[in-house]
C-alpha cells in the first residue's frame, strides 16, 4: 500500500508561515529552493516477486518489501504533454498532445484496430491518419484520447507501472470543477494509481520561481492567462484569460508567409511551427524595426524537401498579434493591456507587491525579445510604478518544474489524495486536499 515518507528534517531554514496560506504554499515556504527541487521520494510498498530472505520473525517474513518510487508529475498542455519524476529539475519526457486517428475507411477494413496513435507511433505507421487534439484552448474536450496519451506516456515513454506511483497533475486556471473529478476517475479507476493530487498551473509556475505571491503571465500553445496570486491563493475574480496563444501566432505566420509568395497549407503547420521557433523574434520597437534595411532581416530556411525559402519582416511581424490582437481578428485585449488591467483591479498594497513579481511562463514566451518587449510596454503604461518582468531560462517548463518541486517537499505529503479515500468518500473528497 502506498504511503508518504516519514518526515525528514533538513529541508532548509524554516520560514514563518501565516495561517492564511494554503498547505501547498506552507510546504514551499518551509523548504529551501536554492539548490533546486528537493529530491525526496515517495514510498510505494508492494510485494516483490523476488524470493524473500528467511527471517527470525514470521511478521518480518510476511512484511512486504519496500521499494522507493518517486511521484510522477504530468503537465498536459494544448501543445505538449510533459512528464517526469518529482525532484528532477526538468521533465524527462515531452510529446505532442496532437494524436492520430485512422480515417473511417481505414478503420472499417480491420487491418489495424488501433484507434489512437501517440508520440513516436505517428511516425511508425502506414495507416492514413487525421490529426486531432483532445484539448481546445487549454480545456479537455476528449477524455478518452487523454487517457490514451497517458497510457502511452506511462507504459511506452517512462516504462513504469502507474499503479506503483503517485501522480501530480496540473490544471489550468478557470477550468471547470468537473475537470478534477474526471482526472481522479481516470487515475484511480483506469490506472489504479495509489494517490494523486491536482494543482493549478499558474500556482505551479509561480513555485518554479521560488515565490509564493506574484502575477503569473502565461502564454502557452492554446491559451494565455494573467493570474494574480497572493500567498498561494489565485484570485479568479480578477484573472484574465485570452483565447490566443502560440498556435494563433503560427497560423498568423502561415498567412504572412503565403502573402510573401509561399504556398503553405494547413497540413504543413508543423513546418511553420518550426520556422517560428527557429527564425522569429519579438521586436522591441516594430516601427523602428521596419526601418532596418530588408537585407539585415533576410534569412534562409531549408524546407524538409530541400527547397529554400527566404524570410524577412515576417520574422517579427507575426509576434505583434500578442500586443495587437486585432491583427488576427480578435476583439480581446493585448497581453500587456490585460496584464495592466489585472494589476489595476488589485488593492494598492497587493498591486505594489505584484508589480515587482511579474512572472513570465509558457513556451510562446521563449521567442527572442519577448520579455524585453513586455517590460517596455508595461513600463510605458505604468509610468508612476516600477513593473518588473521576471524570467527563467526554462520558463517553457515552469508548470512542470513547479509540480516537481511541490510533489517532492515533505510538507506537501499530507495533501496526496489516496485511492482508498476516493473510494470511501467519492470525488468530492478531492476538494479537501486540492484547492
Curated annotation (Swiss-Prot):
The record ties this protein, via InterPro entries, to: Actin, ACTL7A_N, ATPase_NBD
Q: Does the keyword Cell membrane apply?
A: no
**What CDD domains does the annotation carry?**
ASKHA_NBD_ACTL7
Basic and acidic residues bias located where? 47-65
Q: Spell out the residue ranges making up region: Required for interaction with TES.
A: 31-51
Instruction: Please list where the region (Disordered) is annotated.
Output: 1-20, 29-65
Highest taxon of the lineage: Eukaryota
Q: Enumerate the UniProt keywords alphabetically.
A: Cytoplasm, Cytoskeleton, Differentiation, Fertilization, Golgi apparatus, Nucleus, Spermatogenesis
Cellular compartment(s): Cytoplasm, Cytoskeleton; Golgi apparatus; Cytoplasm; Nucleus
Name any GO cellular component annotation: cytoskeleton
Name one process (GO BP) from the record: single fertilization
* Family the UniProt entry places it in: Belongs to the actin family.
* Function description: Essential for normal spermatogenesis and male fertility. Required for normal sperm head morphology, acroplaxome formation, acrosome attachment, and acrosome granule stability. May anchor and stabilize acrosomal adherence to the acroplaxome at least in part by facilitating the presence of F-actin in the subacrosomal space. May play an important role in formation and fusion of Golgi-derived vesicles during acrosome biogenesis.
According to the record's subunit comment, the protein's assembly and interactions are: Interacts (via N-terminus) with TES (via LIM domain 2). Heterodimer with TES; the heterodimer interacts with ENAH to form a heterotrimer. Interacts with ACTL9. Interacts with CYLC1; the interaction may be relevant for proper acrosome attachment to the nuclear envelope.
Q: What is the official name of this protein in its record?
A: Actin-like protein 7A
- Taxonomic source organism: Macaca fascicularis
Amino acid at each position: 500500500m502506498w504511503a508518504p515518507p516519514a518526515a525528514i528534517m533538513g529541508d532548509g531554514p524554516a520560514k514563518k508561515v501565516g495561517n492564511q496560506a494554503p498547505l501547498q504554499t506552507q510546504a514551499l515556504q518551509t523548504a529551501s529552493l536554492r539548490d533546486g527541487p528537493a529530491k525526496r521520494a515517495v514510498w510505494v510498498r508492494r510485494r516483490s516477486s523476488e524470493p524473500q530472505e528467511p527471517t527470525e520473525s514470521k511478521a518480518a517474513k510476511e512484511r512486504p518489501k519496500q521499494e522507493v518510487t518517486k511521484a510522477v508529475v504530468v503537465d498536459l498542455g494544448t501543445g505538449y504533454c510533459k512528464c517526469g519524476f518529482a525532484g528532477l529539475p526538468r521533465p524527462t519526457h515531452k510529446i505532442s498532445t496532437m494524436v492520430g486517428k485512422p480515417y473511417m475507411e481505414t478503420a472499417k477494413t480491420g487491418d489495424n484496430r488501433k484507434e489512437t496513435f501517440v508520440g513516436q507511433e505517428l511516425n511508425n505507421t502506414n495507416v492514413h491518419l487525421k490529426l486531432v487534439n483532445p484539448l481546445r484552448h487549454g480545456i479537455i474536450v476528449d477524455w478518452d484520447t487523454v487517457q490514451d496519451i497517458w497510457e502511452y506516456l506511462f507504459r511506452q515513454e517512462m516504462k513504469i507501472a502507474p499503479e506503483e506511483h503517485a501522480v501530480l497533475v496540473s490544471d489550468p486556471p478557470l477550468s471547470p470543477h468537473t475537470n478534477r473529478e474526471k482526472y481522479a476517475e481516470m487515475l484511480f479507476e483506469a490506472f489504479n494509481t495509489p494517490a494523486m493530487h491536482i494543482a493549478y498551473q499558474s500556482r505551479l509556475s509561480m513555485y518554479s520561481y521560488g515565490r509564493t505571491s506574484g502575477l503569473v503571465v502565461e502564454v502557452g500553445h492554446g491559451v494565455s492567462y494573467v493570474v494574480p496570486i497572493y500567498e498561494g491563493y489565485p484570485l479568479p475574480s480578477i484573472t484574465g484569460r485570452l483565447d490566443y496563444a502560440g498556435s494563433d501566432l503560427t497560423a498568423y505566420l502561415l498567412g504572412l508567409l503565403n502573402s510573401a509568395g509561399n504556398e503553405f497549407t494547413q497540413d504543413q503547420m508543423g513546418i511553420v511551427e518550426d520556422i517560428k521557433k527557429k527564425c522569429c523574434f519579438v521586436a522591441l520597437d516594430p516601427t523602428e524595426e521596419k526601418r532596418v534595411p530588408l537585407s539585415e532581416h533576410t534569412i534562409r530556411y531549408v524546407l524538409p524537401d530541400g527547397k529554400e525559402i527566404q524570410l524577412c519582416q515576417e520574422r517579427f511581424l507575426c509576434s505583434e498579434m500578442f500586443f495587437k490582437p486585432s491583427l488576427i481578428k480578435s476583439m480581446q485585449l493585448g497581453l500587456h493591456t490585460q496584464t495592466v488591467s489585472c494589476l489595476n483591479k488589485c488593492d494598492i498594497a497587493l498591486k505594489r507587491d505584484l508589480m515587482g513579481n511579474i512572472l513570465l511562463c509558457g513556451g510562446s514566451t521563449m521567442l527572442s525579445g519577448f520579455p524585453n518587449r513586455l517590460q517596455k510596454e508595461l513600463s510605458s503604461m505604468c509610468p508612476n510604478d516600477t513593473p518588473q518582468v521576471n524570467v527563467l531560462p526554462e520558463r517553457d517548463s515552469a508548470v512542470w518544474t513547479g509540480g516537481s518541486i511541490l510533489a517532492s517537499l515533505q510538507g506537501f505529503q499530507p495533501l496526496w489524495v489516496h485511492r482508498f479515500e476516493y473510494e470511501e468518500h467519492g470525488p468530492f473528497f478531492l476538494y479537501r486536499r486540492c484547492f
